[in-house]
Amino acid sequence: MQSPTSKEKLQSLLRWIGLGMLCCLTLIGKAEGDWRDNTKLLVYSPRYFGANAFPTPEMYGGRLPARWAAELRGDFHRMTGDKTKDIYASLYIPIAQGKAGVKVQGVIREFYKTSEAVRDERHAVETKPVIPCYGDVVINCHYQVLRSEKWADITVSANLKTASGGRLCDARFTDAVNYWFDTNVGRTLWQTPEASIRLQGLIGFYCWMTNDLIHRQNDALCYGLGLTGQWKSLTLSSTWNGIHGYEKNGDRPMALRFRAEYELLKNALAFQYKKGLKDDLYQAYSISYIRYF
């Protein structure tokens, strides 16, 4: 029997290489197809997305801050089958001595680890990020409508969440915008030179785009109630707020929040605990550093 020549060996090697490349391309194409197929199955609602996908309207107690404020915060979110950590930053810019204000905020980086059960329920691809996951940029524009010690303090706002967040395939951030308009009302119930107690409420309209070919957007009511107490440099607050969508597909999250902030020489530390209710499945712990100017 004659041994294979060098030319025959080379041809055989090239055939095996070609076969291997074909198998790799087939697997890659299948993976890409699976990823794109899964996005059609995603449910664009707070229940079936990550902890930061649907920002909640903020409560200012009817009074806009008169100072610049820069905040850096770390959040730790927990639910059954999902552990999420993130780094958040914001900048509040007062306008016309506090009669208006603009806030720019967002999640700089998100880290997450989900179970396979949560991944499958959300129709996600991965259980943890294979590339860095960045959050959405949110822009809030506020205006002080009324400021009255006798009656009440009232602010209105227009807000936009951009579609800049990543990892849609893992159901972390949507590829669509959210926008909302709300009214904040607050009134001081009791006050001394060093302490005060205020009642606050929020009502508004919240809307986000979806991937549903029939219902292209979900229109919702946003609401909230809260109580804030202040003594010298210490501020304690508790709020209850949420969103009430009309599709009933996990679009009705609520949350209780308890926050403590202590300020010293324009530097403040804040701690917050959030208990998610109904379609908000997360508990969250936060620690913030705020610098006032």
Which ranges hold each PLM region?
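Sequence/structural signature of outer-membrane beta-barrel proteins
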Residues: R73-G81, R109-K113, L146-S148, L160-D170, ...
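Outer membrane beta-barrel transmembrane domains
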Residues: S115-A117, E121-T127, I214-H215, L221-F293
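Detector for outer-membrane/organellar transmembrane beta-barrel domains
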Residues: T174-G245
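Residue-level detection of beta-strand scaffold positions
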Residues: H142, K150-A152, A195-L202, C222, ...
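Cleavable N-terminal export/targeting peptides
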Residues: M1-R47
